[in-house]
Amino acid sequence: MAAKLLFFLLFLVSALSVALAGFEEDNPIRSVTQRPDSIEPAILGVLGSCRHAFHFARFARRYGKSYGSEEEIKKRFGIFVENLAFIRSTNRKDLSYTLGINQFADLTWEEFRTNRLGAAQNCSATAHGNHRFVDGVLPVTRDWREQGIVSPVKDQGSCGSCWTFSTTGALEAAYTQLTGKSTSLSEQQLVDCASAFNNFGCNGGLPSQAFEYVKYNGGIDTEQTYPYLGVNGICNFKQENVGVKVIDSINITLGAEDELKHAVGLVRPVSVAFEVVKGFNLYKKGVYSSDTCGRDPMDVNHAVLAVGYGVEDGIPYWLIKNSWGTNWGDNGYFKMELGKNMCGVATCASYPIVAV
């Protein structure tokens, strides 16, 4: 029996080596892992030893996937193969960005949209913004991470709470810029407590409305005292745990990228929202653009934080912090084409003025 088991393990290692030998340098799977001991025997026992099965087993190991049945393994494998084909076909188009395998590669677009994106929000309240141009020379490029005021990338999990992470990201940056100290603020408080300001917890909301909530609430608690759970809950705000207060919130005029660039360039990071469409969930690097996403106030379905801008290969871009963890995109960040209000990135932009 032991001899048969040893033979089987040697066969798996040999087969994996053959599969790896055929990889192209730009294969989207290469970034997962190439160690033979990363193979999940349960997955290979169901799927066999074909090349895609090895790819899928390594993917599952890399991202800590757990499937409850053979049927689930087969289902997720089928989706994974479809996404892999989509990635390869997209990357062959020689676009300004590339896609790659990440933690969402075993989800259909519908599953991803349901679990990670909030409902579309109406941003028409920003039709006339209150951002004021201040004196100063606009930098050619900007990356607020270099100033040390951008907090670490977080992960919203399977909750459409992106708006809370965009909100706390802007507040954390403003706090650090003001005090020179870092902090982490409570997304869960916003999920649980901000519904009176037209926000809907895991079903979506807007940073501009969250800033107003924090202003009238008298502050937002720290992450340590009100930790993130990723589900709708009962409000448990405590005034003694407040980390930051909001004096006012500033809205960028709807669609005005010149205003947005001025704010990001000379003020600080700005909360923005845009429409995520199929393919963006598998973004890896480069300057993202799309001819299928919308730009209208009712199109936006995901809130993020613009932390800078620049030019890559002749294409101007926004540098944006996401809330899908550091395994996604470029260590949790992405670049979005600048100058076309791409996917509505300047449709729903705002930033807070804070106090301690």
Curated annotation (Swiss-Prot):
GO molecular function list: cysteine-type peptidase activity; feruloyl-CoA hydratase/lyase activity; identical protein binding; protein homodimerization activity
GO CC, alphabetical: chloroplast; phenyloplast
Alphabetical list of InterPro entries matching this protein: Papain-like_cys_pep_sf, Pept_asp_AS, Pept_cys_AS, Pept_his_AS, Peptidase_C1A, Peptidase_C1A_C, Peptidase_C1A_papain-like, Prot_inhib_I29
Active site (UniProt): 162, 302, 322
Chief location: plastid
Assembly: Forms homodimers, homotrimers and homotetramers.
Signal peptide limits: none
Cysteines joined through disulfide linkages: 159-202, 193-235, 293-343
Keyword terms of this UniProt record: Chloroplast, Disulfide bond, Glycoprotein, Lyase, Plastid, Transit peptide
One GO process term, biological-process aspect: phenylpropanoid biosynthetic process
Alphabetical list of SUPFAM superfamilies matching this protein: Cysteine proteinases
Phylogenetic classification of the source organism: Eukaryota, Viridiplantae, Streptophyta, Embryophyta, Tracheophyta
Subcellular location: Plastid, Chloroplast
Assigned protein family: Belongs to the peptidase C1 family.
Protein name: Vanillin synthase, chloroplastic
Summary of the tissues where the protein is detected: Accumulates in the inner part of vanilla pods (at protein level). Expressed in single cells located a few cell layers from the inner epidermis.
